[in-house]
Amino acid sequence: VIVLFLAIEDHRIAPARLAGSLHSAGIAVAALCLRDSMLGHSRYPFRLFELPTSRSFRGLAKALEDAVSTSGARWIIPGDEQSVALLQFLRLRRNVAGLSPGSMAVIEASLGNPCFFDACLLKSNTLRLASKLGIKVPRGFTVTSVGEAVARADDLGFPVFLKESFSWAGLGVVSCPDPISVRQAYIVKAKKRTMLPIRDLFRSLLGRHWYPTGTSIDIQSPISGQVVMFCGIAARGHLMGGICATQLECAYPQGPSTAVRICHEPEIAAAAEKMVVALGYSGFISFDFIKPEVGGEPVLIECNARPVPIAHLGARVGVDLGVFLADYLSTGVLPAKQICSQRSLEIILFPASLQPWPGLQGMCRDIPFDDPALIEFHLAMHPDLALAA
């Protein structure tokens, strides 16, 4: 069984770490990525296809066609949001993508229901769908002007978050303690939109209009509690298995986790399964929830239609997501029910695991000793990094 990673961004950890896990599960991994990237330095891909420097969808589609047909891949795993957006674009515009029927069939098998692509990628649409399913979401509004942003923030009560619908790793989120900060944050984001009609024309001419721009801006109330993520693998709207993890440390406020506790959260797993069924989803997926400090239902805050940095850890707690995928691709048979880990493990994630963490003494460290080039690549990118003993 062969799968292809598509990774447009060069720094993502999850695809590189997951490649080893899939290899251990009996899956052969090919990769279409930048050669000088985290995934490009992994020893596990049996074939590395060079991602073109141009971001024209025609060039990217040609590279994808070559990678799929040459490798014999039956499944594509997007490694980042840009890769998700590109695959969705090619699927929806099959008549102009220039892909063979065989490659298009692989894309179709690797994605969810096209009717719900936006709900996989855009935060506003994710929360709208979740709310319809009876899953609790933050109080909030989509806003279209600075005046509306300030008024809605005042309705919610300060502080609030101002969020871009297409963003990741907390980079599109601004914490606003008062009306002035809401106004300033909205103006900054709105400025990027003033030239959008002209920019979109040029992007269309260059074949770069697959990348989402001008997506909605939301105002949301913050929620006190712990971040709990659910990472799973699905096929045809059936969630085969997953793991939950509570965030113990993060890289920066609203940023990615650096240390987690893998745990059993049946209510969160059930909500994730509801979303997967509604999306008709196929592939690796994760959902971030806030578990309120004072009790009550977990609150869904976002969806990531790609592997996240805990995706390869399932084997440590008896729920190997790679094995689920290998079994499905080998047999076409889906497990009768979702299987989630009920074991616990506290672990510092790579690459944070290379650093000393005085407050996290005795915790397991996820270090890719089996793939040392990943360590070397990260250290070369961060030569001043203080290392753990």
State the predicted function of each range.
Residues 164-165, 219-223, 276-280:
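Short Gly/Pro-enriched turn/cap motifs at secondary-structure boundaries
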Residues 167-170, 248-260, 304-318:
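Glycine-rich phosphate/pyrophosphate-binding beta-alpha loops
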Residues 1-113, 147:
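ATP-binding N-terminal substructure of ATP-dependent carboxylate-amine bond-forming enzymes
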Residues 117-216, 236, 266-270:
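Active-site nucleotide/adenylate-binding loops and adjacent lid/helix of ATP-dependent enzymes
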Residues 323-389:
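Peripheral (often C-terminal) accessory segments that flank ATP-dependent C-N-forming ligase machineries
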Residues 187-255, 262-273, 291-293, 297-299:
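Phosphate-binding site of ATP-dependent enzymes
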Residues 277-312:
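Conserved metal-phosphate-binding beta-hairpin within the catalytic cores
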